[in-house]
């Protein structure tokens, strides 16, 4: 099936509130060594989570387009997750359901698409080259395949630098939600060239 010229809605008056809410403030204090036992324990605690979900604000900004949305991310098992994007008025713009070997996406017109790579599918359908395969780890505060990263003074990720498919991504964490155990990212910003992706997590539910 030919891929449509599908785009999420552009900037709406309500969307400016989302952008303000996503402002990043860098963690303070000296960083800790990536070889520290506290960091290894934190990574293990996060990896031990079987199920989790989070919701919040999403912004994608580039020279070509500006997209603002609410998001809901739910992980129900190994490589099984659901991503929902809604516009500031509450209407669904994109729903993605992924499991091993199968990805289904429904757009804002109700059209259903199937593929085996969620990252490639979202890039083609939305025009937003989101590094989804890596973001699945980064949103948890894990480095994924990245080896160039820094920790904050609480032995949590503060910054990641990662090269993927000729693109150099930088991820900056602006804080953590300590109401959950283990502590989970509260907001983060990804940059690559002239594009930025901002995420602000309102809350986490972990199991």
UniProtKB/Swiss-Prot annotation:
Residues 1-21 form the signal peptide. A lipid is attached at residue 22 (S-diacylglycerol cysteine). A lipid is attached at residue 22 (N-palmitoyl cysteine). Keywords: Cell outer membrane, Chaperone, Lipoprotein, Membrane, Palmitate, Protein transport, Signal, Transport. Plays a critical role in the incorporation of lipoproteins in the outer membrane after they are released by the LolA protein. Belongs to the LolB family. GO terms for biological process: lipoprotein localization to outer membrane; protein transport. CDD domains: LolB. It is found in: Cell outer membrane. It is a lipid-anchor. PROSITE patterns: PROKAR_LIPOPROTEIN (PS51257). This is Outer-membrane lipoprotein LolB. The keyword Transmembrane does not apply. Its main location: membrane.
């Amino acid at each position: 099936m030919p891929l449509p010229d599908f785009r999420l809605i552009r900037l709406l008056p309500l969307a400016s509130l989302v952008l303000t809410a996503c402002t990043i403030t860098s963690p303070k204090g000296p960083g800790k060594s990536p070889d520290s036992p506290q960091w290894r324990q934190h990574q293990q605690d996060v990896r031990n989570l079987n199920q989790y979900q989070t919701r919040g604000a999403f912004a994608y900004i580039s020279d070509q387009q500006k997209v603002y949305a609410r998001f809901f991310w739910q992980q129900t098992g190994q490589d099984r997750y659901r991503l929902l994007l809604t516009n500031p008025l509450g209407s669904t713009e994109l729903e993605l359901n992924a499991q091993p070997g199968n990805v289904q996406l429904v757009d804002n017109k109700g059209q259903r698409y199937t593929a085996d790579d969620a990252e490639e599918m979202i890039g083609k359908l939305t025009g937003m080259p989101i590094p989804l395969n890596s973001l699945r780890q980064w949103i948890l505060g894990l480095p994924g395949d990245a080896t160039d990263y820094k920790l904050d003074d609480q032995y949590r990720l503060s910054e990641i630098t990662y090269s993927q498919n000729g693109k150099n991504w930088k991820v900056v964490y602006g804080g953590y939600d300590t109401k959950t155990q283990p502590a989970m990212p509260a907001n983060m910003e990804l940059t690559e060239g002239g594009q930025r992706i901002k995420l602000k997590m309102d809350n986490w539910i972990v199991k």
